[in-house]
Amino acid sequence: MPILKNLGVSDPKVPRAGTLPLRSSRNPFEEVSGLEEEEAGELGSLPNGTSCRRRATLEKLAGLAPFRLGWAPGRRAGSPGDGQPRSFLGRVLVPGIRRSSADFGLLARLHGTRAHGDEEAAGEAARRLAFLRLGRGSKPQRASLAERVVPAGEAAPEPPPKVPEPPKMKEPLSVLEILSLIQQRELARADEHILELEAEELAPSRGGAPGPPKAEGAGGGRRARDVALLYEALQRELWALVRETLAGPGPGACAGAGAVAQLGQVLVQEEAADGRRGPGAARKLRARWAEAVARAARERLEAAAPGAPGGLAGQLEALRARLLEDMAVVRGRLAPAYPAGLGAFGVYLRGYHGALAEWLGASARRRLPLADRYALLHWHNQVYPREVLGLVDMAALENGELGPLLSPGTLRGLEDECVTDVKAQTRAALLRVLQEDEEHWGSLEDQPSSLAQDVCELLEEHTERAPRISQEFGERMAHCCLGGLAEFLQSFQQRVERFHENPAVREMLPDTYISKTIALVNCGPPLRALAERLARVGPPESEPAREASASALDHVTRLCHRVVANLLFQELQPHFNKLMRRKWLSSPEALDGIVGTLGAQALALRRMQDEPYQALVAELHRRALVEYVRPLLRGRLRCSSARTRSRVAGRLREDAAQLQRLFRRLESQASWLDAVVPHLAEVMQLEDTPSIQVEVGVLVRDYPDIRQKHVAALLDIRGLRNTAARQEILAVARDLELSEEGALSPPRDRAFFADIPVPRPSFCLSLPLFLGRLPLSRLARPSLACLPRPRPPSLARPRAQR
């Protein structure tokens, strides 16, 4: 190869034809000022349109370009690697598949002196660039031969058509570049490069050609650590994005659906990669995503509850509002941005459900007051299913995915604590209310009693709240409250009995005493209704408590009715004493006094509740007729003629009609009493024995408690002394009495003749013949004709004699 020497030229800047421009100095590291300007000014384009940089020089043709040792096989010197000119060091060093993973160690020095240091001087940069340009070969100084071939002024030939270059392979990113993508929230792209890096690290172990041995710290172990660190950084950004998208206003909320979509794409990519990794090496990023959602939900709920006023009830209301707010964000903005296969809405719903279950479980383990337990149970059983889960997509609730917030054992424990506290609190409160009300019973002032209202309010507070939680809890609470009510009513009965037995109370004015008694009676109906309602709601074993409550109230009502009736009839007794006398046949004064007194007391009795009032009026109606008939059957008046019997019967009918009008005005329901006096009047007036027998049969049928002694006394009053007729009439009563011996006796409120005692029945003697010498006037006297029936011999007398 000929060696071209530099021929001396007068002007070094003007090259001659056929000569190569050479430098005055052969030192390749010598800095030459203006070298870059000369290159820019001298390099042009060929007439055919191609760049003059492509011209062939002798050094390039002969392979004499400096630093040839740095060229990689298969690549032209100075050819760009990725569209950019390679530096001198780039041509010297053999490029690897990816930049060394040691670059990741520079992360700790990114914020060092270089990051914040002064910029280097322009001269140093120029010298470094001049040094790097040495590997590019000699610089052309004049036009090439092709420039002289094309005459001036002629058009250059058309360049050949460009052949499309094959697609260039994307160069893998370095660890620092992947980290930069993560920090810029380009999560899907960063995950793709991490997967590539992981695949490169796993390639030798999957049957690839074994590479050269690598030094410790620079081989596969370092790349594996890089992958692990990149995954940690990626997950930090992913879970931070989950928190920020739920946090409302902030950087995460402004990220939009794009960032959430990238998160979902990462999950899909990693799930596909887990299928390739196998079960042992799977990263399970989808499960960790669900855990991150649960952590974010827990943070959201814990931040909402503490600042809410109103105790536990206020905190639960704040939780409800936060749940509705966050689930609306998930349903409207976050869930649509995720891929459909991830089931994002269900994941978020389960995350919030689990976080809420933890919060409620921690609250249930604390010692809560009764009101907070009620609030917790009601929120768990009613508010959450109806107002939270009822407003979300029911597809997430299929097959019981969510499960209960609290375990059945925890719920049962809370209910047991509620029942125990209610039992203790209500019994103490009921006794306190009874003691306070009893203090006013003996006072002379007429104060309205609020005992029944206070008792109902104390118990209904619990019996109304418990069924709204659950039916079973309502039954248990009703049984508990009914037991407490039964104990209270037994104490109430005992104190009412002591009140009426107190001699000082009997010294009160009748009107005051009646008013106090009416107040006690009025406690019965609301308490009775409460007991019946609790028994209907409660379990079957509540029946004994209901019966005990009803028995105590019945006893109190009967006692108070008897007291009121006794007070009234003490005032009426003088008028009843005037009945069935000679003056009674001609003057209605006695009955007018009875009717007037009862009518005057009706205003006071109207203050009584309807149920006890009806029972009291019926009792007054019965007792009034008993007191009216009593003097008649005691023989106070005797009829010696048909005219007298007719007058007595007429008077009886008039009085019966007047009493019937009185008690109708008092709204008495004891209509069965209206016929007793008219029946007696018929027996008094009828003359023939069969008619009397029929009337006696009707009387015995309607009033089963009538006995032969009552019929015999009635026959004595009307003056029936015929023995045969008496026996025929009494036989009717005896037959009906014997036929009904096995039947049950009428109830106490239907008894009439049982309360009317009569003298011992009399019988007629058949006088012997020696009495025939007595005057007929003596034999006609009733005292001789009818004598008292001898007492039957006692069965105990023979034993006494022995």
From Swiss-Prot:
InterPro entries: EXOC3/Sec6, EXOC3/Sec6_C
Domain of life from the UniProt record: Eukaryota
One Pfam family this sequence matches: Sec6
Coiled-coil stretches: 647-673
Assigned keywords, A-Z: Coiled coil
Stretch list, region Disordered: 1-50, 142-168, 200-221
GO BP term, example: exocytosis
UniProt GO cellular component terms: exocyst
Family the entry assigns: Belongs to the SEC6 family.
Pathology noted in the entry: Brain malformation renal syndrome: An autosomal recessive syndrome characterized by brain abnormalities, Dandy-Walker malformation, and renal dysplasia. Dandy-Walker malformation features agenesis/hypoplasia of the cerebellar vermis, cystic dilatation of the fourth ventricle and enlargement of posterior fossa.
Protein name per Swiss-Prot or TrEMBL: Exocyst complex component 3-like protein 2
Organism: Homo sapiens (Human)
Chain's gene name: EXOC3L2
